[in-house]
Amino acid sequence: MIHKLTSEERKTRLEGLPHWTAVPGRDAIQRSLRFADFNEAFGFMTRIAIKAQEMNHHPEWFNVYNRVDITLSTHDAHGLTERDILLAQFIDHVCAHTQPAA
């Protein structure tokens, strides 16, 4: 069974994810990204989708043209888990190598 992060675990784990913010009213984190164009945004989403499928852990996301908004939370645990942290770290790693627009 997947356990929801405790308040202390959450605080400690999120210190390493400065680009992610808490979602108001939910035990979830979010990040918004902008890319040069739709092709770059979709390419980024494809890389994340492949990893998410491998992890069997899928983000909630929204895409319009060059913008991608991502929310992470584990539905089975009703909140933030280590799976969300690992996927957020992977997303940050991909961002560091794809250089989204400011």
UniProtKB/Swiss-Prot annotation:
Which cysteines form disulfides?
none
Reaction equations catalysed: (4aS,6R)-4a-hydroxy-L-erythro-5,6,7,8-tetrahydrobiopterin = (6R)-L-erythro-6,7-dihydrobiopterin + H2O
Q: Which Gene3D superfamilies match?
A: Transcriptional coactivator/pterin dehydratase
- Gene Ontology BP, a term: tetrahydrobiopterin biosynthetic process
Q: Lyase: present as a keyword of the record?
A: yes
Protein's recorded name = Putative pterin-4-alpha-carbinolamine dehydratase
What is the organism of origin for this protein?
Burkholderia ambifaria (strain ATCC BAA-244 / DSM 16087 / CCUG 44356 / LMG 19182 / AMMD)
So what family is this one in?
Belongs to the pterin-4-alpha-carbinolamine dehydratase family.
> Could you tell me the keywords of this UniProt record?
Lyase
Cited InterPro entries: PCD_sf (IPR036428), Pterin_deHydtase (IPR001533)
CDD domains the record matches: PCD_DCoH_subfamily_b (cd00914)
Q: What is its EC number?
A: 4.2.1.96
Keyword Nucleotidyltransferase included in the entry's annotation:
no
Q: Pfam families, alphabetically?
A: Pterin_4a
Q: What GO molecular function annotations does the UniProt record carry, in alphabetical order?
A: 4-alpha-hydroxytetrahydrobiopterin dehydratase activity
